[in-house]
């Protein structure tokens, strides 16, 4: 396994729309393992392949503290949405930035697991939010782009200042 580099917003590569995985093979399983290692090391709960500059429809997540419920979504598609909720989100590609985003309260998603087997998951709460957040990444959307133009501008300014101080 290997740690992967997580792209940082506003890197243009984060806006690349991911292509479907054609075959779930050893290459994809290695990517999944590397994504889990990277996500856990970064103390995240979800990671999309787009964030590590691999533009294929692969997502990993684990909402538990003890890393006991790893979930893999290959070629995920949300087939149903219901309700509305607002939750303060963060992102490994936008470190230190958190803001409230409105999303569906419940979702039904279809995907393949790391063995290439199709499954359906009905999710609510944080899991539903995380699924939508990570699937946005596969469409080239970063959560801050769901905020008002004013908030987006403030975040970009904050990130530019932070970048100047780290150089």
Swiss-Prot record:
Q: What is this protein called?
A: Peptide deformylase
Record keywords, A-Z:
Hydrolase, Iron, Metal-binding, Protein biosynthesis
Q: Which residues form the signal peptide?
A: none
Instruction: Provide the family line.
Output: Belongs to the polypeptide deformylase family.
> Which GO BP annotation is one of this protein's?
translation
Its biological purpose is as follows:
Removes the formyl group from the N-terminal Met of newly synthesized proteins. Requires at least a dipeptide for an efficient rate of reaction. N-terminal L-methionine is a prerequisite for activity but the enzyme has broad specificity at other positions.
- HAMAP family, per database record: Pep_deformylase (MF_00163)
Alphabetized NCBIfam families for the sequence? pept_deformyl, PRK00150.1-3
Q: Specify the superkingdom.
A: Bacteria
For this chain, one GO molecular function annotation is: peptide deformylase activity
Q: Name one Pfam family in it.
A: Pep_deformylase
Q: Which residues form the active site?
A: 134
Q: Which reaction does it catalyse?
A: N-terminal N-formyl-L-methionyl-[peptide] + H2O = N-terminal L-methionyl-[peptide] + formate
Task: Write down the species.
Answer: Neisseria gonorrhoeae (strain ATCC 700825 / FA 1090)
EC number(s) on record?
3.5.1.88
Keyword Nuclease carried by entry: no
Needed cofactors: Fe(2+)
List cystine links.
Answer: none
Record's cofactor remark: Binds 1 Fe(2+) ion.
User: Which residues hold Fe cation?
Assistant: 91, 133, 137
* Broadest EC class assigned to this enzyme: hydrolase
